[in-house]
C-alpha cells in the first residue's frame, strides 16, 4: 500500500506529539495546543507543528516543560495594538534559563514563500508584534526557527533583509531600542535614530552575515 506524503506527515507529527506528551503529562494545556496543531486541517499549520515538534525531539534538554512558559497564544496587547489576532509559537521561561530567548517562532516555509515575505502584511505584522512585546529588549530575545529541509538559511536572511529595507520606518519605530545594540554604518557609535537605521539597511555592505540576522536559526 502506498502512503501519501500528507498522511505520512500526520503520522510523523503524532509520533513527535506523543513523545513530548510522555515527558509533560502534567501540562494538559500545552498538550492541547500541540494536538490542535498536529491534527489541524490546515496543511501549513500542521507542517509547522511537525517542524516544531521535530525540533523539540532533537533538543530535549532545551524544550522541557520547565523551560516553556506558554504555547500558541495571542500577544499581550501593545500600546498601538499592532495585530490583534497575531500569535506566538513558544514563550520561554528565560528566568529559569537565561540562555534561552524569550520567544521562538517556527516557520516551515519553502524558498518561494520566503521570497515573498517582504510584501506579506500578515507576516510583517506578526514580526512587529514580537518586536513590541514586553520583555523583548534586544534581537536575541527572539528566534525564528526555519525548516532547513525546505529553505536555505541564507535565503531566509536575504528575505528578512528585504523586509527591513522595504519596511524600514515602521519596523524601526515599533521598538527603536532593539536596534541600539548594532553599530552605525560609519563606525561612529551605536544606532540611535531612524536615519542611522536607514543608513545601515541601505548600505552596500549590509548583507546576510550581519549580526542583526542572528535571530534566524535553522533546524
Question: What are the roles of these predicted feature ranges?
Answer:
Residues 80-105:
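Active-site beta-strand-loop-beta-strand hairpin of nuclease catalytic cores
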Residues 9-19:
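Bacterial N-terminal signal peptides
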Residues 99-101, 106-173:
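Catalytic cores of nucleic-acid endonucleases
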Residues 20-24:
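Sec/Tat signal peptide C-region and signal peptidase I cleavage site
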Residues 165-219:
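Non-catalytic C-terminal interaction segments of nucleic acid-processing enzymes
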Residues 1-10:
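Bacterial N-terminal signal peptides that target proteins for export
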Residues 26-27, 49, 120-124, 139, ...:
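Short amphipathic alpha-helical segments that mediate assembly, nucleic-acid/protein binding
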Residues 25-83:
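Acidic-basic catalytic patches of nuclease active cores, encompassing PD-(D/E)XK
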Amino acid at each position: 500500500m502506498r502512503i501519501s506524503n500528507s498522511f505520512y506527515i500526520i503520522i510523523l507529527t503524532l509520533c513527535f506529539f506523543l513523545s513530548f506528551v510522555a515527558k509533560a503529562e502534567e501540562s494538559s494545556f500545552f498538550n492541547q495546543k500541540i494536538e490542535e496543531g498536529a491534527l489541524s486541517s490546515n496543511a501549513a499549520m500542521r507542517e509547522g507543528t511537525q517542524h516544531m515538534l521535530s525540533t523539540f525531539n532533537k533538543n530535549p534538554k532545551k524544550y522541557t516543560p520547565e523551560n516553556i512558559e506558554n504555547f500558541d497564544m495571542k500577544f499581550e496587547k501593545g500600546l498601538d495594538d499592532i495585530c490583534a489576532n497575531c500569535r506566538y509559537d513558544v514563550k520561554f521561561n528565560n528566568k529559569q534559563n537565561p540562555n534561552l530567548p524569550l520567544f521562538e517562532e517556527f516557520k516551515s516555509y519553502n524558498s518561494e514563500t520566503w521570497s515573498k515575505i517582504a510584501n506579506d502584511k500578515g507576516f510583517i505584522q506578526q514580526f512587529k508584534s514580537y518586536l513590541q512585546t514586553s520583555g523583548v529588549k534586544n534581537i536575541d530575545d527572539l528566534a525564528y526557527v526555519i525548516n532547513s529541509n525546505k529553505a536555505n538559511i541564507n535565503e531566509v536572511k536575504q528575505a528578512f533583509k528585504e523586509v527591513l529595507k522595504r519596511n524600514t520606518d515602521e519596523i524601526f519605530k515599533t521598538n527603536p531600542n532593539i536596534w541600539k545594540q548594532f553599530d552605525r554604518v560609519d563606525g561612529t557609535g551605536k544606532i540611535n535614530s531612524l536615519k542611522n537605521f536607514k543608513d545601515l539597511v541601505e548600505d552596500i555592505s549590509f548583507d546576510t552575515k550581519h549580526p542583526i540576522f542572528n535571530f534566524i536559526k535553522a533546524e
